[in-house]
Amino acid sequence: MDRLFGLVQASAALEGCTLDIEQCGLLLRDGVSSAGKTISEQLLCMDLRDGYLCAQQFARAREFWSAYRIRSVADKALRNSGGGAPAAGTEPALQKICSLANTQRLHPVEGRSHEVYRASFEIHYLVSQHRIWGPLSDMMARLLMNWLQFECGLEPTVIRKGVIKDYRRVLGSATSEEIGEIFVSFMSDHEADPDETLLPKPSSREQILTLLKAHPWMSTNDLAKEIGISAKGVEKQLGILKERGSLRRVGPDKGGVWEVL
């Protein structure tokens, strides 16, 4: 699920959302909002998560792509952003998207991963070019791109910080000049690397829970040395974890153990 949250956070950030990966994880996993974040950007993340979950459900069920199923995904992803109804006159583009996806999913992916990636990038281009969902078309384009990648067992493409400027520039040029190959070629040069991690280093809280699950007797100083933060910082994180019901102390401070809940 954290991998999915990484996709949501990266895509929402391109739409102006300021939640970082840890804040996004807290919101989507635990329902905990972060101070200073607007309701609209938090709703955007939650709706986008629901859209991704719907797409993953269709992918696991091996459901054929159709305008109806795409609309079902969009209705969830854009629930608080105007709804998932496609713009008037975009039905031919939706049918072409479905045809592209269904052609790829009918054949074994082995030995054809590059071809499938190219098809997913073309789907992205078509959504963006035809502005099927208005100003949020690019966000939906990334979702549909990832949907096909999910279904075909490929590593989902995420637009990383280092390529955001080029991504926007190339996408803008491709759509204005109506030359999809410009964008598809650019994206093909940035296909997801299975050896790359989608998410940054786990948070200190995640590391604490992992360590205590394996070694429940570890002390605050032990945790601090292992994680690389101060003992005071560990104590603060332990307090937060206990308040959230993720952790509890069994027995006395000296001689007791931690229990991960």
Tell where the protein language model's regions lie, with residue ranges.
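FIC/Doc superfamily catalytic core
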Residues: 1-261
